[in-house]
Amino acid sequence: MTVKTFRGSPALSEFRLTQLQQKCQQYQLPITSVYAEYLHFVEQKTSLVEDEIVKLQALLHYGSMFSELKPAGYCLIVTPRVGTISSWSSKATDIAHNCGLSKVNRIERGIAYYFNIERDLTEAELATLKDLLHDRMLETVLNHETEAALLFTQQEPKALTTIDILNGGRQALEQANIALGLALADDEMDYLVESFTALKRNPQDVELYMFAQANSEHCRHKIFNADWIIDGKKQDKSLFKMIKNTFEQTPDFVLSAYKDNAAVMEGSKVGRWFPDPDGQYRVHQEDVHILMKVETHNHPTAISPFPGAATGSGGEIRDEGATGRGAKPKAGLTGFSVSNLVIPNFEQPWENPLSKPNRIASALDIMIDAPLGSAAFNNEFGRPALLGYFRTYEEKVNSFAGKEVRGYHKPIMLAGGIGNIRGEQVQKGEIPIGAKLIVLGGAAMNIGLGGGAASSMDSGKSKEDLDFASVQRENPEMERRCQEVIDRCWQLGEENPILFIHDVGAGGLSNAMPELVHDGKRGGKFDLRSILCDEKGMSPLEIWCNESQERYVLAVAPENLELFTALCERERAPFAVIGEATQAEHLILHDSHFDNNPIDLPMNVLLGKTPKMTREVLSKTVENQSLKIESIQLKEAFHRVLRLPVVAEKTFLITIGDRSVTGMVARDQMVGPWQIPVSDVAVTTASLDSYHGEAMAIGERSPVALLDFSASARLAVAEAITNIAGTLIGEMKRIKLSANWMSAAGHTGEDAGLYEAVKAVGEELCPALGLTIPVGKDSMSMKTTWIDNGEQKSVTAPLSLVISAFARVEDVRKTLTPQLRTDKGFSSLLLIDLGEGHNRLGATALAQVYKQLGDKPADVVKVQRLKDFYNAMQTLVAEDKLLAYHDRSDGGLITTLAEMAFAGHCGVEVDISALGDNDLAVLFNEELGAVIQVADSQLESVREVLKAHNLLGIIHQLGTVTADDRFEISRGSHKLFSEKRSELRSIWAELTYQMQRLRDNPECAEQEFEAKKNPDDKGLSAFLTYDVNEDITAPFINKGVKPTIAILREQGVNSHYEMAAAFDRAGFNAIDVHMSDLMIGRRNLAEFNAMVACGGFSYGDVLGAGGGWAKSILFNPKLHEQFSQFFINPNTLTLGVCNGCQMISNLAEIIPGTENWPHFVRNKSERFEARVSLVKINEVDSVWFAGMAGSHMPIAVSHGEGQVKFKSVEQFAGLKAQGIIAAQYIDNNGSPTELYPANPNGSSEGITAITNLDGRVAIMMPHPERVFRAVSNSWHPENWTEDGAWMRLFRNARMVF
């Protein structure tokens, strides 16, 4: 075989090159300029002929939007790691084969960097430069393209090694423990020596590694299951038993707890929407139960933030999908706690420039890269990210261990979410003897080794290379393919071939497969070489124990293997049968290459009664001084608090994440016409035809634990309740909690504090409230230690409990937001003060911004009053008594009021005379409570409800809402604070601006920041030239044969369900059509009246967004002919949305009337943009937009490559002259715009929808299918009832037939 190199397009934009050059300058590298472009390396089985080369060059021409320069200068080429096959390569090679390029064995891609240098680089400088350019776990740096042949060399498999404990005894095991990073405790080593001595043989390295992962703190939760002795007194219960006590006291509505990958609670009976085996989408009336899971991925995120956070979200998604016999993930949440950001040129008064170890990322780097990783995975998988929190803390304080630095050098990366599951598939099935044991998903690579053990160590106790090796890498498009297989399986109901399923996470197959057979009360016999591998030189340990992502393990009965195989092949999801279940509970792993058994162990040695931990600890108390606030000025204090990340605007964390996919999002973070990120709760609909739904909210007050462990835990639970109380749930028992506990186990005072906190929640507060904690996670190594110039240093996180609350929702339309209303007549603002006037300032945002801690923190004052508050809110929500609601939390009352004013784009006038004597204490305390806006006409009836729930004594009328730009606080006649709301809004937005400036295109960051300063911004609006509530297809319903539409998808597409639902509502028969169906002839486009290409990430956007999908059609003669015939047929309609829009734009050469169509390239911001944008519909001759011309309407936008790119100025002029620009982005004044973020991608003149000349073919980047229901719009006018404005587009299509 030979390797041929093809140049590609420029890889980096001008500002990205500038950023790279600035990094080089930071390290004083003698580099004056940088240029980068893609190189493609093609391994040929035999030489390609001329027309094949032309086809391949066309395939490899994609994404060109940057200035192309002539390569010159010192060159380094970054490629995938030698010996591996990248996920990009797998997808690009698949596309090439689908295009008929059978002589291509494999395509790989690299980036060539060209540097102009002032002098030769030293070895140290070269090493530094290489570190800046590549990820050493995944990539290699080559010096010349001639070295590319190394990428295609196959290495010989490495052999296993044996640890000689029969002769070397425990000492041999101790050496292996250090060398392999096993994190085995002393008693575990004794257990292993004893066990293998009894077996009369030495252990293999893979057996020890498997044992270490399966029995790590990360996997076995030894501290939570330990016996406890505190201050010499034996405790009655373990931590886990106290958590389980909540379920024992309140098991109501819980269907599965503590035994599966996620917990399940009772949901609603609704019309579930999915395709039947014949391919037609239909409604299925059934119970749709709710599953919930929240994970953390702290250690990997500290080491390598983007992949660490990405695989954190990916692993949690797999947990949901692998619940029961298969389930469907639905909506996600994320959270981050880090040390101080110290943003260059935006340093804050409370931030100390403390050091950190080199092996971990800085807080700033984590918050630039980790949220992108988490968002990217959710986006590509197709799960909306609707909820989150972000806290920074790093301060030298007097706490339980004396004066020390407390903070989050080891960060918290929280990943969680909800999903849905069928009632009959909640419980896992039986595994029969002989069942096929299957790995579904991507191939193994030598990455993510030892993640479970590494996560169980305090940061600093393992070697740096082991730290880095323990970080996994992500491939979300592969996980989407796997999920499609799981969906096809559970959708078969009783015919579901999946009997048992687990996800592959910490420990890889070494943990997942033993867990699968052990839970099924079986053993297993496995074939090592049946495992799919993308790295042939791996040892048995590396194959069995690596944590390559996007994999699941399943048990399938032999008679159902053919069905399962067919489902996988249709979705192009790789899988391998690697073993069979055995009656004997014994694990055998055979290696046919070396003809030996790397594993031959009884299950009870691996997962049996390993030594139980006993924690003998002492409790500690702390005495602190009260806050020194005498010299603090209110204005300065509030400005500081508004800049503190836990309070500041977090748009930079939100608009990077898709919040509309599924079409079932009823409440995301962004609130009201001005899309302000202040929602307390996330809400989804249970189906695409119902108002039942699900809600999620977060509670977290970790700094309080530096003063009072149990108060911090109680506040986390209570805050989750005050956040979720603004939607219609019903009785509190309906709410279920996930508890994620983070602690520095072994640190002075922390163990006893952890026990105290768990007891406060598990034994006291939750049982008193009727709350259950059926799921959770612990991370017990939240301490970072290192040596700095010979000095031992450490940063220890506070005990951190993050509570995530989940609930069934009775009616998603009854969800309050913090948006103050000025269009509802006279109204009043009321404070419900659950703190009952205590006004404690310990561990508040105010304390933090003045580098203090204080003495007394907030706490739950009366448990019954919290319950009364919740019940009162449920009554008020059900009866539509309130206009707005926002809980009091970080930043205190003044922040609550400001955020409500920001959301309402209005002013407030309040008087705090009745709340206490100390202004700062009144305004900045973080006691529990909420502010409600009540129309004066409802004031008396609201008071009656509050009185009925014993709350009247803690209600305070604060003041009123005004339509101007003033934010005013008074004490009687004395004005304490008066400032323009718009100026406060600007201060609040500074953090987002600063982060976007560093991370994204700085020009876009500037434009958005300026837009936020505008006090006259009108916000989103809707002006329709038709009646939104009119169904123009009503005369056709149930008359004649329905037209059929192909809901076309390729691997990685994720928006097909909601697209099918929209067309079904319009009167079509919607048919699920995968490209694989067309390729092998299961389906033909000639069967359909219409076709829609759906949104998502086909082929993971390899070869350009939509490019690979399109080229697999253009270069496949059979598909080329089929699509061409469909497009020229005057009786057909075609729609392309988002990824489908990008794809169809690349088919322009076979679509009549499209000679002036543009291509779509990367957004100007160079960031995935998820926004609600305003568009204007133009007068075009197209059935799709009939009757809509002149309308201004909001629509969901979610894409990374939506900017139009024309071949020439003449082509752009030609498009305009043809009058086929159907829609343009407009600003809030109704004018087409190129300014960000009103125009989210920078398209010329705001172009976002185009038709062909006869109007039968339409392409558009925004998502009408995600907002065809009014309830799924983030904001909409109140006169919209069931249908959203975009339902008209789908009904227009039906009118043709």
UniProtKB/Swiss-Prot annotation:
Any GO BP annotation: 'de novo' IMP biosynthetic process
GO cellular component: cytoplasm
Residue positions of the active site: C1138 (nucleophile), H1263, E1265
Keyword Disulfide bond: no
InterPro entries: Class_I_gatase-like, FGAR-AT_N, FGAR-AT_PurM_N-like, PurL_large, PurL_linker, PurM-like_C_dom, PurM-like_C_sf, PurM-like_N_sf
Keywords: ATP-binding, Cytoplasm, Glutamine amidotransferase, Ligase, Magnesium, Metal-binding, Nucleotide-binding, Purine biosynthesis
Disordered, as annotated region: 301-329
Domain Glutamine amidotransferase type-1: 1045-1297
Family per record: In the N-terminal section; belongs to the FGAMS family.
Oligomer and partners: Monomer.
UniProt name for this protein: Phosphoribosylformylglycinamidine synthase
Gene, per the UniProt record: purL
